[in-house]
Amino acid sequence: MNGIIPLWKERGMTSHDCVFKLRKILHTKKVGHTGTLDPEVEGVLPICIGRATKLAEYVTDEGKVYVAEITLGKSTTTEDATGETVMTKELADISADELQAALTKLTGKITQIPPMFSAVKVNGKKLYEYARAGIEVERPSRQVDIYSLTRLNGEATLNEANPTFQLEISCGKGTYIRTLAVMIGELLGYPAHMSKLERTRSGFFKKEDCLTLAEIDEMMQASDSSFLYPLEKGIESMAKLVIDEEIHAKVLNGGLLPKSLFIEVENEPRAALIFNDKLTAIYKPHPEKNELWKPEKVIELHQA
């Protein structure tokens, strides 16, 4: 079994829980997810099965879309609703224009510091392990891409009686939405936290494409595997090169290929090689031999 499943991860489960349950449902060990979703977050979680696990990093690298509920006037230890209250501040009126000005400032390339309650590693230990022990450590900042921030629930003024708003976030990999909520609050002069989150898109998979674990289980029991998307779906944005049988034979042996073969994709960081409409391998420019390209992954799906 090879392919990608757009799973709808339900609230209360870890991403690893989903992988564990799918291994049982699908009767296969080769199952991998494409980027962790916190347990209290629900949403699109593409799962790679069989040879598709070789593509997990490329699927993870694609953009994401979230719908978040952000609450102003209160910050928490975890930057979301699960944490203890750190600070509160009564809200004066915040107009739609003031909020939009803050959102505009946070669109584009921004720098974030990961929250203490996160899986980022510092000195070989996950940040949440330090946080649970009550230890605050210096966290490395990271640059992330925010493509768009769109308020969803109208233009009502925010105040003490109406402290929350919904926001659609289109962003690149590695963005912490919790931290974004705090940053929006800071620009407005208030403590803030992310009170709810749903991932509505991951890469090329949307909410409406997804199935729950129960639905996949039901289909498997009916011997229906139509929930599997082909591997090619995971590399839709990657440059592609159709190869002939002679090149294909070299690719199967992991051979180096001449740069001249890649003229139409020469400015790309990598290219997917397609034979008989199937993904065969992913190649990239050789780091030392300027006239050659080398295999990054050999997929061999055509032999499955």
Swiss-Prot record:
The active site is at D38 (nucleophile). Keywords: Isomerase, tRNA processing. Its EC number is 5.4.99.25. It comes from the Bacteria. GO terms for biological process: mRNA pseudouridine synthesis; tRNA pseudouridine synthesis. SUPFAM superfamilies: Pseudouridine synthase. GO terms for molecular function: RNA binding; tRNA pseudouridine(55) synthase activity. Pfam families: TruB_C_2, TruB_N. It catalyses: uridine(55) in tRNA = pseudouridine(55) in tRNA. Responsible for synthesis of pseudouridine from uracil-55 in the psi GC loop of transfer RNAs. Belongs to the pseudouridine synthase TruB family. Type 1 subfamily. This is tRNA pseudouridine synthase B. The lineage of its organism: Bacteria, Bacillati, Bacillota, Bacilli, Bacillales. The gene is truB.
